[in-house]
C-alpha cells in the first residue's frame, strides 16, 4: 500500500473535519440531547408526582365523601328524632286538650244537673205549698186527700 500525498491530504482533511465537528458540532448536539434527557426525566418525575397527587386527591375525596355521608346520616337521625319529639308533644297536647274539654263538659253537665235539681226542688216546694193550701181549704176527707196527692204526684 502506497501512501501518497492524496491519502495524506485526505487524512489531514479528515482530522480537521473531526476536530471541527468535535469543537463546533458535537457540543450543541450533546447539549440538545442532554436537554431532551432532562426534559424527559422532569416529565417522568412530574408524572410520578401527578400520580401521587391524584392518589392523594382520590383518598381525600373518598374521606370527604365518607364524612359527608356520616354528617348526612346524623342530620337525618336528628331530624327523625325531632319529628318523633314533635309528634309526641302534639299527642300530649291533644290528650291534655281532650281531657280539658272532657272536664269542662262534665262540669257543665254537673252544673246543669244541679240547676235542674234546684229548679225541680223549687217546683216541688211550690207544688207542695199549693197542695197543702188545697188540702187545708177543703175538708179533710181521705178520698179527696188521696185524689189531691195523686194530682200532685202527677204534676211532679
From Swiss-Prot:
Q: Which UniProt keywords apply?
A: ATP synthesis, Cell inner membrane, Cell membrane, CF(0), Hydrogen ion transport, Ion transport, Membrane, Transmembrane, Transmembrane helix, Transport
Keyword match Lipid biosynthesis: no
What coarse category fits the chief subcellular location reported for this protein? membrane
Q: Which domain of life is it from?
A: Bacteria
Q: What InterPro entries is this protein classified in?
A: ATP_synth_B-like_membr_sf, ATP_synth_b/b'su_bac/chlpt, ATP_synth_F0_bsu_bac, ATP_synthase_B_chain
Cellular localisation = Cell inner membrane
Give the CC-aspect GO terms.
plasma membrane; proton-transporting ATP synthase complex
Q: Which GO terms describe its molecular function?
A: proton-transporting ATP synthase activity, rotational mechanism; proton-transporting ATPase activity, rotational mechanism
The record's annotation in SUPFAM superfamilies points to: F1F0 ATP synthase subunit B, membrane domain
To which protein family does this belong?
A: Belongs to the ATPase B chain family.
PANTHER family given in the database record: ATP SYNTHASE SUBUNIT B (PTHR33445:SF1), ATP SYNTHASE SUBUNIT B', CHLOROPLASTIC (PTHR33445)
What does the record give as the function of this protein?
F(1)F(0) ATP synthase produces ATP from ADP in the presence of a proton or sodium gradient. F-type ATPases consist of two structural domains, F(1) containing the extramembraneous catalytic core and F(0) containing the membrane proton channel, linked together by a central stalk and a peripheral stalk. During catalysis, ATP synthesis in the catalytic domain of F(1) is coupled via a rotary mechanism of the central stalk subunits to proton translocation.
The subunit field of the Swiss-Prot or TrEMBL record says:
F-type ATPases have 2 components, F(1) - the catalytic core - and F(0) - the membrane proton channel. F(1) has five subunits: alpha(3), beta(3), gamma(1), delta(1), epsilon(1). F(0) has three main subunits: a(1), b(2) and c(10-14). The alpha and beta chains form an alternating ring which encloses part of the gamma chain. F(1) is attached to F(0) by a central stalk formed by the gamma and epsilon chains, while a peripheral stalk is formed by the delta and b chains.
Protein name, UniProt field: ATP synthase subunit b
The source organism is Photobacterium profundum (strain SS9)
Amino acid at each position: 500500500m502506497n501512501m501518497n500525498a492524496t491519502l495524506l491530504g485526505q487524512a489531514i482533511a479528515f482530522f480537521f473535519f473531526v476536530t471541527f465537528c468535535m469543537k463546533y458540532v458535537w457540543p450543541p448536539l450533546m447539549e440538545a440531547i442532554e436537554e431532551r434527557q432532562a426534559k424527559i426525566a422532569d416529565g417522568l418525575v412530574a408524572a410520578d408526582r401527578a400520580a401521587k397527587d391524584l392518589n392523594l386527591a382520590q383518598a381525600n375525596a373518598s374521606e370527604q365523601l365518607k364524612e359527608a355521608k356520616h354528617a348526612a346520616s346524623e342530620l337525618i337521625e336528628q331530624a327523625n328524632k325531632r319529628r318523633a319529639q314533635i309528634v309526641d308533644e302534639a299527642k300530649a297536647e291533644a290528650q291534655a286538650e281532650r281531657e280539658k274539654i272532657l272536664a269542662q263538659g262534665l262540669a257543665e253537665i254537673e252544673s246543669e244537673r244541679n240547676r235542674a235539681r234546684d229548679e225541680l226542688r223549687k217546683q216541688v216546694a211550690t207544688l207542695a205549698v199549693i197542695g197543702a193550701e188545697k188540702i187545708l181549704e177543703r175538708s179533710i176527707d181521705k178520698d179527696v186527700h188521696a185524689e189531691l196527692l195523686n194530682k200532685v204526684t202527677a204534676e211532679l
